[in-house]
Amino acid sequence: MRKLFLDAFKHEKLEKPPIWIMRQAGRYLPEYRAVRSKFENFMDMCRNADACCEVALHPLERYDLDAAIVFSDILTIPEAMGMDLKFIKGVGPVFSDPIESEKDLNRLKSAEDSVGDLEYVYNAVRTTKAAINVPLIGFTGSPWTLAAYMVEGSGSKQFSKLRKMMYANPQLMHALLQRLADITVIYLLEQVKAGASSLMIFDTWGGILPLEQYKEFSLKYMEYIAKNVKQKSNVPVVFFTKGGSNFFEELKDKSCDGVGVDWNVTLDQARHRIGVGKVLQGNFDPAFLYGTSDSIRNTVKKNMEFIQSDKLNNYIVNLGHGIYPDINPDNVKIMVDAIREFSV
């Protein structure tokens, strides 16, 4: 197995930085769309281990990447807890029965009763792991991000229902977050047992919070998960809070091994705020892949020259968020090939 991706977490000198791409198995690839068309709804596809494996392999077959990520969705946990999840075209994920009260919280299944309903995810991990020669990344949404959809009922620009609960009924908010954190620990450990070599916690909506609320309602539970997972496994764990660069100083002493960095902060700023103890992952703007081949190469050159000058060995090349569905796959190859021309 190629171990460059895992070697980055050892803080040893590497000849070149590892590469993978958030949402690398996704709608921008025609072969993904062909597989997706065979399923009436998205979750049916997620429950098919062979389909999950096939789409996870597509980017590895096209590009020289150093890791795969299991094909799944962050909302598998709320659905396993008994919530009614539907993916509506043009809207996205929708829960018809959002959490509004303690009564709603009490109707959710326990962690122990929920994990069995997630066996299809572990099957996807096992099937994919057997088919690849690179490390496999398992993942979850952060409790705060899962709660955002569970309370709001869908995605939102303001998440006013979620934030109202946080301020008006913090006890209920914490009770929900703790329930989610407990099941997430089991969920991630099961992914490790099935073959995941690294784990990532996607805190997609942590960036909407003020600092003190971020520490209390988001980071606290990510840290709880990482601590408990690492007590029973030795796989690296990466935190990624979208729009969270203002919170980087809070991560210095946390249990994560790496930090995802978006494009709103430079790598040197991120390193200064986080310190040398964490691997940095990122931070190309996904939109730069809309550019010409020359502009893509020039952007790569600027970033990689910084990495060379800083001897930034604990660094993983990635986008600052998921790749957009209308990106030209050929431009991804230009990016990957340009990165491969550089050594640390």
UniProtKB/Swiss-Prot annotation:
Substrate binds at residues 23-27, 73, 149, 204, 321. GO terms for cellular component: cytosol. Signal peptide: none annotated. CDD domains: URO-D. Gene3D superfamilies: 3.20.20.210. GO terms for molecular function: uroporphyrinogen decarboxylase activity. It is found in: Cytoplasm. Its EC number is 4.1.1.37. Pathway: Porphyrin-containing compound metabolism; protoporphyrin-IX biosynthesis; coproporphyrinogen-III from 5-aminolevulinate: step 4/4. GO terms for biological process: protoporphyrinogen IX biosynthetic process. InterPro entries: UROD/MetE-like_sf (IPR038071), Uroporphyrinogen_deCO2ase_HemE (IPR006361), Uroporphyrinogen_deCOase (IPR000257). It catalyses: uroporphyrinogen III + 4 H(+) = coproporphyrinogen III + 4 CO2. Keywords: Cytoplasm, Decarboxylase, Lyase, Porphyrin biosynthesis. The record marks 73 as: Transition state stabilizer. It comes from the Bacteria. Belongs to the uroporphyrinogen decarboxylase family. Homodimer. Catalyzes the decarboxylation of four acetate groups of uroporphyrinogen-III to yield coproporphyrinogen-III. This is Uroporphyrinogen decarboxylase.
